[in-house]
Amino acid sequence: MSVPFRALRCRDEVAVFFLAAPGPLMKPEQVQAQMSRVLSSAIAELRDPRVPLIVTVERVHVTPDYGQARVYVSAIGADMPELLDALTHARGRLQRELSAHVRMRRTPTLEFHAADDQRFPAAPGSTW
C-alpha cells in the first residue's frame, strides 16, 4: 500500500510531503474531556497536604492552538488560593501525566483557576 505524496521543487532541491490518510480527528471537546479525566486522576494521586482528598475538575478549556489549557477546579471546604498554589507547584508533574495519556503533538501549559458558579451557570431545566 503506497502513501500519497506531493513533491514540490524548491530551487534544486525536492521536498517531499507525505499526505496523512484521512482518519478520525479528535474534536476540541473530546480533547478537553479526555484531559479532564486524566487530570482528575493525576490530581487525586498528588501527595501534597494542601490538596484535599476530593478535588473536582469542573472544566478544561484549551486554546485553538492547544498551547494553553485553563483548568477550572473546585473542592469542598478547601482553601482555594492554597489549593491553586499547590496545583501550580505540581504543574510539571501534571503536564507529564497529561502527555503520557493524551496523544497530542504538544502538551499545553496548564493554568489553574477556581470554578465559580457565575462562570458555569446551571443548565436550563436543571433543578439545582
From Swiss-Prot:
<keyword id="KW-0963">Cytoplasm</keyword>
<comment type="similarity">
    <text>Belongs to the RbfA family.</text>
</comment>
<comment type="function">
    <text>One of several proteins that assist in the late maturation steps of the functional core of the 30S ribosomal subunit. Associates with free 30S ribosomal subunits (but not with 30S subunits that are part of 70S ribosomes or polysomes). Required for efficient processing of 16S rRNA. May interact with the 5'-terminal helix region of 16S rRNA.</text>
</comment>
<dbReference type="InterPro" id="IPR023799">
    <property type="entry name" value="RbfA_dom_sf"/>
</dbReference>
<dbReference type="GO" id="GO:0043024">
    <property type="term" value="F:ribosomal small subunit binding"/>
</dbReference>
<dbReference type="InterPro" id="IPR015946">
    <property type="entry name" value="KH_dom-like_a/b"/>
</dbReference>
<dbReference type="GO" id="GO:0042254">
    <property type="term" value="P:ribosome biogenesis"/>
</dbReference>
<comment type="subunit">
    <text>Monomer. Binds 30S ribosomal subunits, but not 50S ribosomal subunits or 70S ribosomes.</text>
</comment>
<dbReference type="GO" id="GO:0030490">
    <property type="term" value="P:maturation of SSU-rRNA"/>
</dbReference>
<dbReference type="GO" id="GO:0005829">
    <property type="term" value="C:cytosol"/>
</dbReference>
<dbReference type="InterPro" id="IPR000238">
    <property type="entry name" value="RbfA"/>
</dbReference>
<dbReference type="Pfam" id="PF02033">
    <property type="entry name" value="RBFA"/>
</dbReference>
<protein>
    <recommendedName>
        <fullName>Ribosome-binding factor A</fullName>
    </recommendedName>
</protein>
<keyword id="KW-0690">Ribosome biogenesis</keyword>
